[in-house]
């Protein structure tokens, strides 16, 4: 909440005060400003009716200039369990060093067709201007907003605990535990040194905010022998690193069971949603600071990838149901940043330490995979195309080995085969990153055919792409090849994803030229069968892995929709003979049984009030209704009772089979993207 005024009442934020609206005094921004889209303007002024003296007006010797009042941030977080900060006071802008100009980074990576291609390196060095000549103004109000964000570090132990619990589910391959642990360690020390034994915490946080701005515009100078601790001592106190912290903690609330968030004493939904809102606003604010400063750094690319994952969980991946395109917009920013950093080409930076080069590879793979999954889900052209990139496979090493001392690191490298895979058969090292890159390449091949408007030679292209997909899948090491006797859900997930790419190719062939219906149905049935097999294995173990649940919704629902549509079509008395293939009998009984089990599992594992729950439940009801029609056909002659069968939730014989078939064929079976690398 805001700092109290002299009369003891809480101050309103500036937008609410000027609009004469009731402010709820929430931090870092009030909820009313969030709803009105004025979160950027939401600040708390200690003396709103006072004005600073205009600089252009000459001062008389007999009068003393009044000091300009800085903006006061809110003192506490939204939920009651977190303690309040100490009362805040003001600080004069004179303490801000050079508030008008600060340096920012250059344009970044230049390719062979850029203007630099016409000059030699020595000529470019002559005309290159030092970064200190390039500057951008910093508004003192931005410093005050930064202090508001830094107030959240008072609750750093909560964010660290959430991060720790997140890594118990699955070791991250883009951002691993050693990276996040070091980030929390440095920030805890920075915050403690800035605020301990201080009677004026806000003044200290203003100074710390200035330090963060100064660090953010300062390039991170590295050397080949640099350690992770040394790197983070320079990189942690920057706004992009704070964005990564809040984005990671907020995303973890979607991956952890609600009871494990440490907020059991609060109302479950309110506490969880409150934490998510604070994290998303703080992460967004930090990225805005970086954008204002023109920052270009490795940590910025990390923060952007994590923020995009967070946005997808919170707002969805499309505008189909929530009218929100922020995830797609963020993907554009990620693409711009990784290209400017040159992550799409082999790393030639001789001053970068080993661990930083490997993190760069994983970041690029994460951006590439995100681009493919989002492009597939939305049916849009991908932004990062393989033909223009030379993306490197990360080494199959754990994060602990990547950041370890040279002796330990070299020993781990010695246990890699010539292709870079570990010879121990461990999937929890770097195998996920490498397999994700292979799967994303295959997905781009499927996209190239599916999004093309050319029909000539389509069947031949589809068969060629299917063969290439199978070869790519079989090129993975044996411990990533799925068989029914393997119980690792992540191995099954990679296998299902390759099958789904074939499913998309067959769907394109069938919808464009009406061929390959048998292969299309069989591929959908194969996907559903493997999914149900994995759910059964996981249920018996007592805990279903998040990857299985995501696959059940993201890949399973479109496949189930295909089976459902074809089942109903072939169950109609007037079904044409052309739809049935005499060589391949239609597995009607098997499809009905597996769809019935699929519906039950979907209803069980779809998380209420999160992500794609509404679309998921809608699809489940549609499949249930189709099964009812197949098993208990409606009387002949029943006509439609509504133009919108879903809004009226028809059951049994509410609408005719013809109308229901048209509705079923036009129903959007696509689910929210699963973002497997976020697990």
What is each model feature region?
Residues 294, 513-679:
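Fungal C-terminal regulatory tails
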Residues 1-253, 258-266, 270, 326, ...:
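Intrinsic, low-complexity transcriptional activation domains
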Residues 138-152, 165-183, 228-250, 266-392, ...:
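Extended, leucine-rich alpha-helical cores of fungal transcription factors
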């Amino acid at each position: 909440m805001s700092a109290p005024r002299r009369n003891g009442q809480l101050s309103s934020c500036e937008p609410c005060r000027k609009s004469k609206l009731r402010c709820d005094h929430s931090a870092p921004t009030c909820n009313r400003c969030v709803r009105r889209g004025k979160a950027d303007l939401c600040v708390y002024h200690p003396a709103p009716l006072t004005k600073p003296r205009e600089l252009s007006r000459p001062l008389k010797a007999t009068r003393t200039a009044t000091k300009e009042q800085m903006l006061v941030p809110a003192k506490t977080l939204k939920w009651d369990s977190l303690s309040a900060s100490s009362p805040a006071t003001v600080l004069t802008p004179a303490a801000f060093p050079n508030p008008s100009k600060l340096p920012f980074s250059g344009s970044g990576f230049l390719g062979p067709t850029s203007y630099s291609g016409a000059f030699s390196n020595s000529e470019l060095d002559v005309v290159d201007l030092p970064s200190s000549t390039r500057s951008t103004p910093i508004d003192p109000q931005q410093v005050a907003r930064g202090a508001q964000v830094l107030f959240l570090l008072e609750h750093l132990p909560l964010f660290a605990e959430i991060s720790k619990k997140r890594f118990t589910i699955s070791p991250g391959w883009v951002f691993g535990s050693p990276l996040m642990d070091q980030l929390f360690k440095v920030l805890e020390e920075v915050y403690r040194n800035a605020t301990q034994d201080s009677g004026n915490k806000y003044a200290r946080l203003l100074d710390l905010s200035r330090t963060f701005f100064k660090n953010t515009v300062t390039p991170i100078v590295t050397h080949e022998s640099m350690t992770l601790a040394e790197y983070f001592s320079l990189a942690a106190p920057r706004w992009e690193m704070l964005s990564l912290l809040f984005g990671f903690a907020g995303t973890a609330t979607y991956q952890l069971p609600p009871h494990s968030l440490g907020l059991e004493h609060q109302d479950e939904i309110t506490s969880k949603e409150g934490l998510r809102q604070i994290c998303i606003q703080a992460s967004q604010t930090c990225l805005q600071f970086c954008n204002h400063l023109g920052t270009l750094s490795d940590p910025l690319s990390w923060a952007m990838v994590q923020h995009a994952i967070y946005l997808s969980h919170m707002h969805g991946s499309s505008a189909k149901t929530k009218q929100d395109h922020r995830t797609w917009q963020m993907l554009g920013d990620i693409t711009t940043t990784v290209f400017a950093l040159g992550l799409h080409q082999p790393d030639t930076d001789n001053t970068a330490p080993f661990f930083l080069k490997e993190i760069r590879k994983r970041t690029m793979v994460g951006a590439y995979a995100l681009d493919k999954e989002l492009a597939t889900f939305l049916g849009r052209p991908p932004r990062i195309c393989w033909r223009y990139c030379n993306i490197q496979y990360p080494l199959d090493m754990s994060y602990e080995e990547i950041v370890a001392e040279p002796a330990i690191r070299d020993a781990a490298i010695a246990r890699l085969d010539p292709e870079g895979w570990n010879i121990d058969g461990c999937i929890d090292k770097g195998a996920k990153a490498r397999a994700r890159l292979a799967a994303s390449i295959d997905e781009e091949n499927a996209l190239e055919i599916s999004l093309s408007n050319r029909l000539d030679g389509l069947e031949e292209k589809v068969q060629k792409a299917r063969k290439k997909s199978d070869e790519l899948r079989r090129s993975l090491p044996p411990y990533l090849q799925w068989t029914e006797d393997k119980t690792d859900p992540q191995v099954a997930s990679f296998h299902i994803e390759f099958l789904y790419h074939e499913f998309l190719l067959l769907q394109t062939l069938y919808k464009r030229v009406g061929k390959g219906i048998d292969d299309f149905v069989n591929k959908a049935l194969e996907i559903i069968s493997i999914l149900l097999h994995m759910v059964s294995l996981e249920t018996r173990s007592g805990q279903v892995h998040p990857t299985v649940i995501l696959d059940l919704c993201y890949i399973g629902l479109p496949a189930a929709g295909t089976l459902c549509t074809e089942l109903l079509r072939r169950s109609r008395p007037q079904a044409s003979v052309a739809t049935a293939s005499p060589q391949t009998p239609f597995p009607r009984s098997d499809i009905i049984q597996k769809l019935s089990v699929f519906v039950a599992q979907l209803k069980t594992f779809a998380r209420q009030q999160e992500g794609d729950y509404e679309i998921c439940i809608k699809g489940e009801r549609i499949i249930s209704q189709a099964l009812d029609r197949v098993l208990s056909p409606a009387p002949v002659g029943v006509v439609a009772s509504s133009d919108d069968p879903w809004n009226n939730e028809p059951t049994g014989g509410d609408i005719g089979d013809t109308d229901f078939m048209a509705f079923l064929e036009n129903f959007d079976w696509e689910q929210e993207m699963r973002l497997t690398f976020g697990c």
